[in-house]
Design a protein with these regions (language model features):
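Hydrophobic transmembrane alpha-helices
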Residues: 1-47, 51-54
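Membrane-embedded alpha-helical hairpins and interfacial helices in multi-pass inner-membrane proteins
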Residues: 28-33, 41, 61-162
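Hydrophobic residues in alpha-helical membrane-spanning segments
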Residues: 47, 51, 55, 103-104, ...
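Extracytosolic (periplasmic/ER-lumenal) interhelical loops and adjacent juxtamembrane/interface segments
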Residues: 56-60
Length: 162
């Protein structure tokens, strides 16, 4: 039992660290009205391990803080990632194309309002939904599905114990 808890925490911490590093490395395209947050491709990891749900939340929280995001962005952006990751976990046994939808939808519905009210972006909300949505489709949909394809080969070795 203790070994499972250690494995769960270790996987969550590693996923959080990966999210932070990817957010930092790709910072120029990870923030703003038009953004492609490469780290969001990791939101497919709840398909493989439940440890990804808290790991992604903590990673997004730390990534937003270290990226200099405003407090509402830190809070609501991280909640969007948490909701998306939890949704992916709930859909993990469905078609993988459905499993990547929750983070896309969560970010489309939350992030445009953060951009408007935290950063004062004057673009129309529907346009912000479109730009955030395109970035999420690229990161979660395209890159996330590529990650699923690669990880499916090694899932029993990487995620077998959580």
């Amino acid at each position: 039992m203790r070994d499972k808890k250690v494995t769960f925490l270790t996987q969550a911490a590693m996923i959080a660290a990966l999210y932070v590093v990817l957010t930092f490395v790709f910072a120029p395209i990870s923030f703003g009205e038009v953004q492609i947050r490469i780290a969001e491709m990791l939101t497919v990891l709840p398909i493989f391990t439940p440890a990804a749900v808290p790991g992604l939340f903590v990673g997004c929280l730390i990534g937003n803080i270290t990226g200099g995001a405003m407090l509402p962005d830190v809070i609501f952006g991280s909640i969007a990632t948490l909701v998306g990751a939890a949704g992916t976990y709930c859909l993990r046994n469905t078609n993988r194309f459905f499993a990547v939808l929750p983070p896309i939808v969560a970010n489309i519905l939350i992030v445009p309002f953060v951009l408007r009210y935290a950063y004062g972006v004057v673009l129309p909300i529907p346009f912000l939904m479109l730009t955030v949505g395109i970035g999420e489709v690229v990161s979660c949909g395209v890159l996330g599905n590529c990650l699923i394809t690669v990880l499916n080969r090694y899932k029993t070795r990487i995620f077998s114990r959580a």
